[in-house]
Amino acid sequence: MDLEAKVKKMGLGHEQGFGAPCLKCKEKCEGFELHFWRKICRNCKCGQEEHDVLLSNEEDRKVGKLFEDTKYTTLIAKLKTDGIPMYKRNVMILTNPVAAKKNVSINTVTYEWAPPVQNQALARQYMQMLPKEKQPVAGSEGAQYRKKQLAKQLPAHDQDPSKCHELSPKEVKEMEQFVKKYKSEALGVGDVKLPREMDTQGPNRMLLPGGDRSTTAAVGAMEGKSAEPKRTQYSCYCCKLSMKEGDPAIYAERAGYDKLWHPACFVCSACQELLVDMIYFWKNGKLYCGRHYCDSEKPRCAGCDELIFSNEYTQAENQNWHLKHFCCFDCDNILAGEIYVMVNDKPVCKPCYVKNHAVVCQGCHNAIDPEVQRVTYNNFSWHASTECFLCSCCSKCLIGQKFMPVEGMVFCSVECKKMMS
């Protein structure tokens, strides 16, 4: 790809969603403008998923690429125009049966995603077993939740080198090998089934949670009498409660036939969020979303949110950083060898801290330097000096002394307080 094409591609990526309002900051944000490398809005610092950006086609491309070259190619279709794999998510439209019987206008409910099962009643049951605020009904809180989780759990930059910032040829190759490996060893999509279906699909003797085994025939069959197969009593692998016979359960092929989950229990073991569209990663007996599976395999840069494939990176404040991305969160100046202050888990250089975040001294009304000692009471602060932390009436120094706070003022005694009231 020549330089002009690269620049054009980069420009298109930064134009997507430009100006979209932030659903979190409301009018405080001037509109979405993608930071050059941080994956956040330059105006409000929120992620793209927090903005009212229409991402359905982009998300379908992302998931389609995830399923490319896997056993889940039945879930994708390639566009004739450019050959890009697109996710064929199952959209379900349900008709309100009560309204239909009463001969009135029929109400319909559209789910932006539903499990791809032939039995629509089973899909309906599955949806009803999810928390209402997480059911992906079009235009609802649940649809917004699904959109956020698609962005959070399956970042495009965890699978596509072209979505990353300035990878070297060696890093691109390492990332491609990493993606190929997790597709073949960890990636899976859950299946919605009734527990009784598992007895006909699993091995003749299956391990139950806890290690017990169940046989497939009753004792009477040993005497030549016909008998119904004995049904396995399944428990949810997550909550350990029993599975009800007629309720849908989720089966994860990579986990094995002996494990089932309640729909609301099919969650990432790290973030405890519902696994979006039942897309999971299996590792060491645990379910993960894509993000947290990758985090368990590779360090992630706290600056750009990308996985680190370079041997050289830095660690600070219990986080990992590309060398070029350990920067001030406000001005993007590199912080190597500089004084910085952590603000909401983000490093900020000293000048930006004083300008944007420092508390103001109630005594001198100047910003308090991060390296200077201070006295704080409730929401008020003072320089811990003989010039600032003084009685608001008689100017007695209060360092190491008892004091009486009153609405941003401090007094050395009841008498001084009365004189100022």
UniProtKB/Swiss-Prot annotation:
SUPFAM superfamilies: Glucocorticoid receptor-like (DNA-binding domain)
GO molecular function, one term: zinc ion binding
Region of interest called Disordered, as start-end residue ranges on this chain: 133-164
GO CC, any one term: focal adhesion
Keyword Repeat assigned: yes
Positions with biased composition (Basic and acidic residues): 155-164
Domain PET per the UniProt entry, residue ranges: 92-199
CDD domains: LIM1_Testin, LIM2_Testin, LIM3_Testin, PET_testin
Keyword entries, A-Z: Cell junction, Cytoplasm, LIM domain, Metal-binding, Repeat, Zinc
PANTHER family: LIM DOMAIN-CONTAINING PROTEIN, TESTIN
Domain notes: The N-terminal and the C-terminal halves of the protein can associate with each other, thereby hindering interactions with ZYX.
Record function comment: Scaffold protein that may play a role in cell adhesion, cell spreading and in the reorganization of the actin cytoskeleton. Plays a role in the regulation of cell proliferation. May act as a tumor suppressor.
Protein name in UniProt: Testin
Species whose genome carries this gene: Neofelis nebulosa (Clouded leopard)
Native organism taxonomy: Eukaryota, Metazoa, Chordata, Craniata, Vertebrata
Gene behind the chain: TES
